Amino acid sequence: MSTEPNCPFSGNARKHTAAGAPSNADWWPNQLKLNILHQHSAMSDPMGEAFNYAQEFKSLDLEAVKKDLLALMTNSQDWWPADFGHYGPLFIRMAWHSAGTYRVSDGRGGAGSGNQRFAPLNSWPDNVNLDKARRLLWPVKQKYGRKLSWADLMILAGNVALESMGFKTFGFAGGREDIWEPEEDVYWGSENTWLDDKRYSGDRDLENPLGAVQMGLIYVNPEGPNGNPDPIAAARDIRETFARMAMNDEETVALIAGGHTFGKTHGAGDVKHVGPEPEAAGIEEQGLGWNSGFGTGKGGDTISSGLEVTWSTTPTKWGNNYFDNLFGYEWELTTSPAGAQQWKPKGDAGAGTVPDAHDPSKRHAPAMLTTDLSLRLDPAYEKISRRFHENPDQLADAFARAWFKLTHRDMGPLSRYLGPLVPKEQLLWQDPIPAVDHKLVDEQDIAALKTRILASGLSISQLVTTAWASAATFRGSDKRGGANGARIRLAPQKNWEVNQPAELAKVLQKLETIQKDFNSAQSGGKKVSLADLIVLGGCAAVEAAAKKAGQDVKVPFSPGRMDASQEQTDVDSFAVLEPAADGFRNYARKGLEGSAAELLVDKAQLMTLTAPEMTVLIGGLRALNANVGQSKHGVFTKQPETLTNDFFVNLLDMSTKWQKSATSEGVLEGRDRATGELKWTGTIVDLVFGSNSQLRALAEVYACSDSQKSFVRDFVAAWNKVMNLDRFDLA
């Protein structure tokens, strides 16, 4: 038998990792997906660590960009001709589909990162031919380079498209930074077939956190639920999916009517003529997909959704003709040339009133989607639609505001908005916080306040738990939540089970007394906000706990938070931030105990934590006795409220044998191997740091005999990160 290596250029060349060997996830599909904690690092980012997009964007001549985009709108290209001689409707669809993936439940999706450039979104069935829209934008992106992200450009192009067709938009903010690899943390559904809908159970109950009815769609099936052309049933789907994007009925009607004022859908022929999506297309396609063999494959022969609908007689001009047509005709079911279910005026009504997108010698009748008929046949939608029809100015205002909300919902607070086009009006969904209007506390004040807090009778665990509860609502997905605003004292957060309302009220009462006493004793307008005081209390407690462990540390603290009012807090909007589980506080709602480890990783990802940061925080918070309800699960120490590495030392102690509790779901018992004596109890969240090989490797670092100092150092750094997650003013 020959031992000579195969020639690397022969057909028997060895395969390498990039050729697609089975991954660990293929072998063990149920293992924790810790990779979601290490996305978008400097290793995948070509811009360099010194790159500051906000500064680059501020130097951008936005009016020049808009001028270039305006010229592009009517500069039709032979390789992808513009419908009606205008690319505006295509760019509106691109921007809408970039933003429309947002779901309020976990804040993921949305337009904030330019993720439409990558799989799976770039290849979703609902995004057919949006690859062409981005290629049309490439000369603009190429011209302005690092000053203008793809994420901002896609939304700006949608705005300019609307303005170029006579619509006045509400405004535009830049500040969206591009990612450079696909997102691994977003759960788009369990289906492995496009347009499948295993996400439903019971009486059409849509799985959380999903915001679309089928795999690969943005919202709903335009033909109706599973292709059933029932406008009333479709209205139910519309209402559910738009609500999951934080839109009410009026905003929903405005968005559908406003968007469908422009452009058309494409179903010139059978979809069997359409080639594979971009991620499956051949290398010669250079990232484009859906190459069609029907006729020319473009222009009048374009196939996208399979539906062939033009709603308005003026598809490149803002107006009220969408509602004129919706209410002006009686509608009957028909099929597109591709066989898709759609609606036409009964008889020959409306014939010749709608222009052809590419042949000026042809005219057509208007058409509607099943989901358009929902706006006429659903009683609540109809009432709004008729009001908009009779009051076009109300439609224009509602659409402008809803479009702005759609395209900016995941950008976070107003302080992150960049550029001269940011509207002055502050909106409730932006979670407003008052601007700093007083002199901030200095180092001497901070030291005095710490002393007062620690002498107040509040325990280390009370102070730590309250600060954590205030800060840990932050979501990096849509930049909501966090300690700024002190909304933990307001509804709904003050009533959340995880925040232990009765205990929280006691802590807040004492902190408010300290705040009042301090502020009343000051001159020159100096004040401390309760938001700052809550965080400072946690920092003081961490320092005290470290001192008990024999280490003097100074936990960083940056004043400047302000206190929001109840009027500035939308209770329903903030309700979605309530955690079903918070493994850092060893909390999970009943029934979720078995998936607590996965929920911990999900929360850590939303808080932008790495696996090492998550690990050290768990160990520290257990030592600080910060569990909900003062539960002893995972408090593997004989000296609670002392910042030691005991959690890791005792978790990895081989003299302890672990077994599942016979009486408590999700709880394990650690017993002495020799005597059987019960030593500790822990949850799945605690024990996963010993069972998962990657987390055990991290736990071992902090369990070593020389790791106490590094443990405290790393805990303080991670704690400081969490306390400042929403301090965009410090960046």
Curated annotation (Swiss-Prot):
Q: Provide the GO MF annotations for this entry.
A: catalase activity; heme binding; metal ion binding
Q: What is this enzyme's catalytic activity, as reactions?
A: H2O2 + AH2 = A + 2 H2O; 2 H2O2 = O2 + 2 H2O
What does UniProt give as GO cellular component?
A: cytosol
Spell out the residues of the site Transition state stabilizer.
Answer: 93
Required cofactor names: heme b
Where are the annotated segments for Disordered? 1-24, 339-365
Kindly state a single biological-process term from the GO annotations of this entry: hydrogen peroxide catabolic process
Q: What UniProt keywords are attached to this protein's entry?
A: Heme, Hydrogen peroxide, Iron, Metal-binding, Oxidoreductase, Peroxidase
| Sites where the protein binds heme b | 260
* Top EC class for this record: oxidoreductase
Query: What EC identifiers does the entry list?
Result: 1.11.1.21
Query: Tell me, what's a Pfam family for it?
Result: peroxidase
Q: What does the record note on quaternary structure?
A: Homodimer or homotetramer.
The family annotation for this protein states: Belongs to the peroxidase family. Peroxidase/catalase subfamily.
NCBIfam families, sorted? cat_per_HPI, PRK15061.1
UniProt protein name: Catalase-peroxidase
Its ancestry begins with:
Bacteria, Pseudomonadati, Pseudomonadota, Betaproteobacteria, Burkholderiales
Gene from which the chain derives:
katG
